[in-house]
UniProtKB/Swiss-Prot annotation:
Family, per entry: Belongs to the UreF family.
Protein name: Urease accessory protein UreF
Quaternary structure and interacting proteins, as annotated: UreD, UreF and UreG form a complex that acts as a GTP-hydrolysis-dependent molecular chaperone, activating the urease apoprotein by helping to assemble the nickel containing metallocenter of UreC. The UreE protein probably delivers the nickel.
PANTHER family the UniProt entry points to: UREASE ACCESSORY PROTEIN F (PTHR33620:SF1)
Pfam family, one: UreF
Species assigned in the record: Psychrobacter cryohalolentis (strain ATCC BAA-1226 / DSM 17306 / VKM B-2378 / K5)
C-alpha cells in the first residue's frame, strides 16, 4: 500500500502500534519536558485554564502546524522511499528550527531515548534488511517517523497521533505546574481536539517554502527557563 495516501485505513496492528508510540507510559522520559510551558507559568503569561487554551492554540497553529507536523510527513515518506539525503535534510532542518538550547536538547534526548527503546524491541533500522541508516544526531520527530513507517501507520494517522501526544504532554505538564485540575485539562482536550484535526489538514497542504515556526514568545520563555531558579521540568 502507499503509506502516504490519506485514504488508507489503518490496520488494527498499526493502530495499536501508534497507540503504544504516543502512550504517556512509553519509557522515553517525555514527562520531564514541558517545551517552554513551565516558563510561561513562571513569567505570568499563563495563569488559568482560558490562558492555557490560548497558549496551546498558538503553539499548535504557529508551531506544530508549520513545523513538526509537515516535516513528520516528509520524514515518513523519506523512510518509505529509502531517501537518506531527505532524512538528513529534514532532520537538520528541524534542529535548525529549535530556537533554544533546551528545545534542541529535548528533541535530541527524546530521539536518543526512543532509539534505545527500539533497539531493545529489535525495531531499529537495519542496513542488512535494506533500511537506510538514521541520520547523525536524529531528533525525536525523525525517529517517530521511522517507527510509524515501520508499523505501517499511514501518514495522516501518524500526524494525528503525534499531535495528540503533544497535547497530552502539555496538559500533563500544566496539571503538575500551573496547577490545572484534571477536569479542566479534559475540557481543554475536548476544545482542542477538533483543532488537532484542522492542524493536520493544513500541515498536509503546506509547501516547503511555507514551513517554519513563528513562536517568538515560546523562544523567549524557553531561553529564560534555562536560568529559572525553581523548576519541575527540563525545558
Amino acid at each position: 500500500m502507499r503509506i502516504d495516501d490519506p485514504s488508507n485505513a489503518v490496520s488494527d496492528l498499526a493502530l495499536l502500534g501508534l497507540m503504544q508510540l504516543i502512550s504517556p507510559a512509553l519509557p522515553i522520559g517525555a514527562f520531564a519536558w514541558s517545551q517552554g510551558l513551565e516558563s510561561a507559568f513562571e513569567l505570568g503569561w499563563v495563569n488559568n485554564e482560558a490562558q492555557l487554551g490560548e497558549w496551546l492554540e498558538g503553539v499548535l497553529g504557529d508551531g506544530l502546524t508549520r513545523c513538526e507536523l509537515p516535516v513528520l510527513a516528509r520524514l515518513q515518506r523519506c523512510w518509505a522511499n529509502n531517501d537518506g539525503d531527505g532524512l538528513a535534510f529534514w532532520n537538520d532542518w528541524l534542529h535548525a528550527n529549535r530556537e533554544t538550547a533546551e528545545l534542541s536538547d529535548e528533541d535530541t534526548r527524546l530521539g536518543q531515548a526512543l532509539i534505545r527503546l527500539l533497539n531493545s524491541l529489535e525495531l531499529q533500522p537495519q542496513k542488512a534488511l535494506g533500511h537506510v541508516e538514521l541520520p547523525e544526531e536524529p531528533g525525536y520527530v525523525t525517529v517517530f517517523a521511522w517507527t510509524a513507517h515501520q508499523r505501517q501507520v499511514p501518514v495522516r494517522q501518524a500526524l494525528l497521533g503525534f499531535a495528540w501526544g503533544w497535547l497530552e504532554n502539555q496538559l500533563a505538564a500544566a496539571c503538575k505546574a500551573l496547577p490545572l485540575g484534571h477536569t479542566a485539562a479534559q475540557r481543554l482536550n475536548e476544545t482542542l481536539r477538533p483543532q488537532l484535526v484542522a492542524a493536520v489538514d493544513k500541515a498536509l497542504t503546506l509547501t516547503d517554502e511555507q514551513l517554519g515556526p513563528i513562536l517568538p514568545g515560546l523562544a523567549l520563555g524557553s531561553a529564560q527557563h534555562e536560568t529559572q531558579y525553581s523548576r519541575l521540568f527540563r525545558s
